[in-house]
Each structure stands twice: as structure tokens, then as C-alpha cells.
From Swiss-Prot:
The gene is Dpy19l4. The chain crosses the membrane at residues 51-71, 160-177, 183-201, 246-262, 268-284, 291-307, 313-331, 351-369, 420-440, 465-485, 487-507, 521-541. One of its GO terms (molecular function) is glycosyltransferase activity. It is found in: Membrane. The keyword Transferase applies. Belongs to the dpy-19 family. It is an enzyme of class 2 (transferase). It is a multi-pass membrane protein. CDD domains: Dpy19L4 (cd20180). Probable C-mannosyltransferase that mediates C-mannosylation of tryptophan residues on target proteins. Keywords: Acetylation, Glycosyltransferase, Membrane, Transferase, Transmembrane, Transmembrane helix. It comes from Mus musculus. This is Probable C-mannosyltransferase DPY19L4. InterPro entries: Dpy-19/Dpy-19-like, Dpy19L4. Its main location: membrane.
Length: 722
């Protein structure tokens, strides 16, 4: 029996020895085989080639976007075949105001004189001197005018093409920055190309450049995209010193520039600062970097405060309060042995301070700093979230604006049709679950690995991923309330979704949860990170590329003959010193096309201008001719322009027409239960004044009309007929 056992065991032992012997032989052979000398150089060359190809792809993507915008703009407006007046009419509303100041700077006899006229402007709005540089953030127009004259471009290109070219160039930089951000997060420039594809396909929801070129956001968001790209690189682990310094420098310059070109930039940066604060709480090892970024915020705020002529809105901004509270907590930070009960109590106390100190600091600052700039924003938010009810015309008019309403179902349908929304939700869920898993691992006291490899499958441990997930959730939550914010959120949806489907680490995280046995998870993750974006790209190419080509080949026409005729009449017939009154949007076009003084402008950061707008809009209410005359003469208006589109507005949403909002504000309709109806014995002014009977003809004389506009001269001498 023993012998049998011996014979049965012996073959197994020999087999084991043979196997171990062969492994040792292979290992010895590998050790003795000299490593090829060119391997490190080859790896360096491969990495260098990858970076060069990725950078070229990023730049080419940006340039292609610029060429596409230029071609589409030409096809839509026939810009090269238009006269100067017809070109300028394409700048509607507040966009017209910005471009008009660019023209004024080019006409100024000197740079100093031009800046002085901007900062002490009394030729735009009657009876009012404004600092246009501060109120409208006109640094882009100032710099564009300087570049146009300094480079000698006036001999080569028309001013309007130079201006549009700069904005289109910034849009190319915008796309390039999104490309780089997605590349940095995923490690492959394939993600950048998918980001650009989704951005272009969903451009109705990613940018407003096609509708209004001079908008502040079209100047500002490209710098914000550069700032986010720099921040993404700065937050990455194992970054060498030179790369970290470069990212920090780019972060500083882009943050400051972003703050200077858009008056609402500090609100966007506040959301980013909250995201970084949560990152600091979630990922302790990034605390020093978060502190450095906060230093950039505070430097940009104070430098912006000085260069924006001591703009009080920056001092009372929530961003400054949050940054100040964070730095104060860091100075008072107590040390406790990690993991002890005392350390946990200290952490809870610090979190409490970070929640309460910003509010306290903001209230203290507002006690000493006059801050009319933010009052209308707070009132609007109160009404928006149902905390208050109001009959105020301005607030209700703002609430009726499409950009300040909740997104429509069409928005979600478009994102789903391009496959963007489903993949974004998938990536977001995986990242959130991984972050939750990592959080509970740390709460349970498990040690964190210094370097996370692909095989670990922990996408939620990377600080830049944590930041982006938190940031996109905050932006997305607000975009669900106000559609205008989708133009900030949707580009980052494109970037995050593209990063996810192209990231082997994200697929590895998912596969480790599924615990597949048939295929090696790492191999499958690498295959999926290349196959899935390729399939998405091919499907997008097949479905949407023909549409993009059709848009470029399809001839469109934008022509507004009535507005052209009105502007021509004003330039030929109206006195140079005349003052015009009408809707703020039309006044912006008049200021640009004619240069004449107006009574109001489409600006919503000045309480006096908001009140002016409401008063001038009374021409569409049920007020007497005498009331309207008193309002117009109080602003020294010489001419009144009634727009038929507003007077006879049908509107899809009842209660949001200008005349409805005026009736609510004036008490001529029932707004809510308990209201007393105030009967108006007068008809709607814009209708009655067209009939030409007394007393309207005593106060106003019609001097011009066409299908869309009726121009009335405000009589200086009133003769009443008996």
C-alpha cells in the first residue's frame, strides 16, 4: 500500500518540480537577457509622439470649428454681400450695445480719449452719465479696438470682420480646451475628438454664438474652459514640478481674464469653489492645492475690484465670502491625531465653520459696502423659487424670459438623440458609486494606496474626477431650473461623457464590480475604451455629418427691411441731438446703427435702467396720453417708436406678453385671489395713438411709419382742440 502510495505520489512531485524548474529557467533567462538600450528612448519618443499628435488634433479641432462657424455665419446672413447698416442689424438687443462701443473706440481721436468717453459716457442714455466699462464689462471691446489699430488691420480687413474673427477664434480655443480637458482625464486624445463631435452636434444647447456674437458669455466661457483644463491638470497626482507650475500659471491668468470679461463670472466661480471645498473634505491630500486655487480666487477678486473701478459687486459676492471663510478656517485649523475621537470632533467643527462663516462674512461685508447691484438678483431668486409673489413688471418679465425658465423636453430629447445624455448618465453613475465606495473605505479606516493603477479599478479616487463630478452635478442642478445655464453645463456634459467611454480605468471599475471570469478584465477594459467610442463616432458620423454639410450648403436669408428703413429714416431725418424712446432691445439697435441718444438700454444690472425700461414700456399699457407724455418728457425724449410686434403680440404663453405683465403691474387684471380690479377708462395707448384723435394728436405727431414701426414726435407745444 505504501508502495502504491509512493508510486502515486511520485509522478505529481516530478510534475511539480518540472513546472517550477521551467519557471525558474524562464526567470533566469529574462534576468540574464540584457534589456535593449533603446527601450527608454523608444518609450520617451512614443510618449512625445502621442503628445504631439494629441496637440495637433486639439488645434485642428479648434480650427475646424472656427471655419465651420465662419462658413455658417456667412450662409445664414450673407454677410459679405450686405451693406454696413444691414450687417449691424444682425446684432440684436444687448449684443448691439457691445459692438457699438467697439465702433466708438475706433472713432475716438486717441486711446485715452476713447477710454475717458467710455468711463464718463453721457451720450448714450439721456440725462444719465454711466461708466460703461464697469457696467457692461467692455474690456473685450477695448482690447479688440487696440489690436485692430495696433496691428494695422484697418488697411486689410473691415472692423466688423476683425471683431467677429476674434470671437470665432475664442470659440476655437473653447473647443480646444474641452478637447484637452477630456484628454487629460482619460489619457487618450480619442476622448477629445468625441467631445468635439458631441459639442458640434449639440451646438444648439452648447453655445449661443450663432444667434448673438458679442454676448459676454461668448467672450468669457472660452477662458473658463481654459481655466477648467488647467485646474484638471493641476489636481492630477504625480505631476512633475514644471507641469504643475505651468498649470497654476494658466489657471491664474484664465481665472482673472474670465472675471474681467463677464459681470456674472464670480457666480460661476463660486460654484467651482464649492466643488473644490467638497473635494477638500472628500480628498484630504488635495488640501494644499485647493488652498492655492483659493489664493488665485482672492487675488483675481481684488485685482478685478481695482480694475473694474472699485466694483462693489465683487466685494459682496458669495465667492469672496467663501474664500475668506476657508482661509480663516485653515488659519485656525487644529491638529489632532488622525483617527482619534478628538480628530473627528475637530473635523465636524471645521465643517460647521465652513457652512456658517461664509454667510456671516457676507452679511458683515454688506453692512459696510453699498451693494445695489445684487438686490435685483436676490429678489429674482426669491420669486423664482416660490419664496415670494410679486406684481413687479421687471421681475415678472425676467421670469418669462426663455433663458430663465426650466428647460423644455426638446432639450433632453436632443441630447438623447445624439446619445450624449445616456452615456453621461452612465459615466456619472459609475463615478458616483466609485466615489461612494472610496469614501466608505476611508471611513472604515482602510489605508489609501499612494498610486492607483489601472488594475485597481478605482476611478473615484482620482481628485480631478471627484472635482468634475461634483461640479457637473451643481451646474446640472441649476441648469434644470434655468435653461440659460445649459450653455455652461452641456459642454462639460460632452467632456465628461467622452472621458468616461474612452477611459480604460472607468471600464475597469465597472468590470471589477461585475467580476467577469471568462475574459481578463484589464484586456476587456482596454478593448471597450477603444471599441465603444469608435462605434459612437461612426454612428454620429453616419447620422449627423450629412446634416452639418447640408447646413453649410443650404442658403439662408436674414433680412429685416422694416428695421433698415427705420434706421435710414433716423439717420436722414432726425436731428443729431434727438432722443429716442421705445423698447430697450430696439434702443440698443438704434444706438449701434445711428449713434443717437436713447432713453433706455437692455441692461439688467442697473436699478435705474430697469426702472426706466418699465416706465418706457408703459406705452403698451392702458394709460392716458397725458401719463405717457409726462413719462417721456421726464427723460427728455423727442421721438417715440411703437413696435407693432409688441403692441399686437400674440405669444405662446399667456401672461408673459409685455402688455399682460403691464396690466398685472398696474392692477388692470386680477393677479391672485383677493386682488381688487382697478378699471382703466383708457384704451391701450399703442392702439389708441394710431387712430389720430384727440387728445393723442395734441401730445404726439406721427412722422414716420411702416409695417413694423410707428414713429411719433413728442410735441413740445401742446395745443388742445375744443
Amino acid at each position: 500500500m505504501a508502495k502504491e502510495e509512493g508510486t502515486s505520489v511520485e509522478p505529481r512531485q516530478r510534475k511539480k518540480q518540472r513546472t517550477s524548474g521551467s519557471q525558474e529557467a524562464k526567470a533566469e533567462k529574462i534576468r540574464r537577457t540584457p534589456a535593449p538600450e533603446r527601450a527608454p528612448k523608444y518609450v520617451s519618443f512614443q510618449r512625445f509622439a502621442k503628445i504631439v499628435i494629441g496637440c495637433l488634433a486639439a488645434v485642428i479641432s479648434g480650427m475646424m470649428h472656427v471655419f465651420y462657424l465662419s462658413a455658417y455665419h456667412e450662409r445664414k446672413f450673407w454677410f459679405s454681400n450686405r451693406q454696413e447698416l444691414e450687417r449691424e442689424i444682425t446684432f440684436q438687443g444687448d449684443s448691439a450695445i457691445y459692438y457699438s462701443y467697439y465702433k466708438d473706440m475706433l472713432k475716438a481721436p486717441s486711446f485715452e480719449r476713447g477710454v475717458y468717453e467710455l468711463t464718463h459716457n453721457n451720450k448714450t442714455i439721456s440725462l444719465k452719465t454711466i461708466n460703461a466699462m464697469q457696467q457692461m464689462s467692455l474690456y473685450p471691446e477695448l482690447i479688440a479696438s487696440v489690436l485692430y489699430q495696433a496691428t494695422g488691420s484697418n488697411e486689410v480687413i473691415e472692423p466688423v470682420y476683425f471683431y467677429i474673427g476674434i470671437v470665432f477664434g475664442l470659440q476655437g480655443m473653447y473647443v480646444t480646451a474641452l478637447f484637452v480637458t477630456s484628454w487629460l482625464m482619460s489619457g487618450t486624445w480619442l476622448a477629445g475628438m468625441l467631445t468635439v463631435a458631441w459639442f458640434l452636434i449639440n451646438r444648439v444647447d452648447t453655445t449661443r454664438i450663432e444667434y448673438s456674437i458679442p454676448l459676454r458669455e461668448n467672450w468669457a466661457l472660452p477662458y473658463f474652459a481654459c481655466q477648467v483644463a488647467a485646474l484638471t491638470g493641476y489636481l492630477k497626482r504625480n505631476l512633475n514640478t514644471y507641469a504643475e507650475r505651468f498649470c497654476y500659471l494658466l489657471l491664474s491668468t484664465s481665472t482673472y481674464t474670465f472675471m474681467m470679461v463677464w459681470e456674472y463670472s464670480h457666480y460661476v466661480l463660486f460654484l467651482q469653489a464649492v466643488s473644490l471645498l467638497l473635494l477638500d473634505i472628500f480628498s484630504v491630500e488635495q488640501s494644499d492645492k485647493v488652498y492655492e486655487v483659493y489664493k488665485v480666487y482672492i487675488f483675481s477678486l481684488f485685482l478685478g475690484y481695482l480694475l473694474q473701478f472699485e466694483n462693489p459687486a465683487l466685494l459682496v459676492s458669495p465667492l469672496l465670502s467663501l474664500v475668506g471663510a476657508f482661509m480663516l478656517v485653515k488659519c485656525l485649523q487644529l491638529n489632532g491625531k488622525k483617527g482619534t475621537f478628538v480628530a473627528k470632533v475637530i473635523k465636524v467643527f471645521e465643517f460647521y465653520l465652513l457652512c456658517t462663516l461664509p454667510v456671516t462674512l457676507n452679511l458683515i461685508v454688506k453692512m459696510f459696502v453699498p451693494h445695489k447691484e445684487n438686490e435685483h438678483v436676490l429678489k429674482f431668486l426669491e420669486v423664482k423659487f416660490g419664496l415670494n409673489m410679486t406684481k413687479n413688471f421687471t421681475l415678472n418679465w425676467l421670469l418669462c424670459q426663455e433663458s430663465l425658465q426650466a428647460p423644455s423636453q426638446d432639450f433632453f430629447f436632443r441630447l438623447t438623440q445624439s446619445s450624449l445624455l445616456p452615456f453621461y448618465v452612465l459615466v456619472l453613475i459609475i463615478c458616483l458609486l466609485s466615489m461612494t465606495q472610496v469614501f466608505f473605505r476611508r471611513m472604515s479606516g482602510k489605508s489609501k494606496k499612494e498610486t492607483v493603477t489601472l488594475e485597481d479599478g478605482r476611478i473615484g479616487e482620482r481628485p480631478e474626477i471627484i472635482y468634475h463630478v461634483i461640479h457637473t452635478l451643481l451646474l446640472g442642478s441649476l441648469a434644470m431650473l434655468m435653461e440659460g445655464l445649459k450653455f455652461i453645463w452641456t459642454p462639460y456634459v460632452c467632456m465628461l461623457a467622452a472621458f468616461g467611454v474612452c477611459s480604460p480605468e472607468l471600464w475597469m471599475t465597472l468590470l471589477k464590480w461585475l467580476r467577469l471570469r471568462t475574459v481578463h478584465p484589464m484586456l476587456l477594459a482596454l478593448i471597450l475604451s477603444m471599441a465603444v467610442p469608435t462605434i459612437i463616432g461612426l454612428s454620429l458620423w453616419k447620422e449627423f455629418f450629412p446634416r452639418l454639410i447640408t447646413e453649410l450648403t443650404e442658403l439662408q436669408e436674414f433680412y429685416d427691411p422694416d428695421t433698415v428703413e427705420l434706421m435710414t429714416w433716423i439717420k436722414r431725418q432726425a436731428p443729431v441731438a434727438a432722443v429716442f424712446a421705445g423698447s430697450p432691445q430696439l434702443m440698443g439697435v438704434i444706438k449701434l446703427c445711428t449713434g443717437w441718444t436713447v432713453t433706455s438700454l437692455p441692461l439688467y444690472s442697473d436699478d435705474d435702467l430697469l426702472q426706466r425700461n418699465e416706465n418706457i414700456y408703459q406705452i403698451y399699457s392702458k394709460r392716458s396720453a397725458e401719463d405717457i407724455y409726462k413719462i417721456l418728457t421726464s427723460y427728455k425724449a423727442n421721438y417715440l417708436i411703437v413696435e407693432d410686434a409688441i403692441c399686437n403680440e400674440l405669444g405662446t404663453t399667456r401672461g408673459c406678453r409685455v402688455k399682460d405683465l403691464l396690466d398685472i403691474a398696474n392692477g388692470h387684471v386680477v393677479f391672485e385671489e383677493g386682488d381688487k380690479l382697478t378699471y382703466s377708462k383708457y384704451g391701450r395707448f399703442c392702439h389708441e395713438v394710431k387712430i389720430n384723435y384727440s387728445p393723442y394728436v395734441n401730445y404726439f405727431t406721427r412722422v414716420y411709419w411702416n409695417r413694423s414701426y410707428f414713429v411719433y414726435k413728442v410735441n413740445t407745444v401742446i395745443s388742445f382742440q375744443s
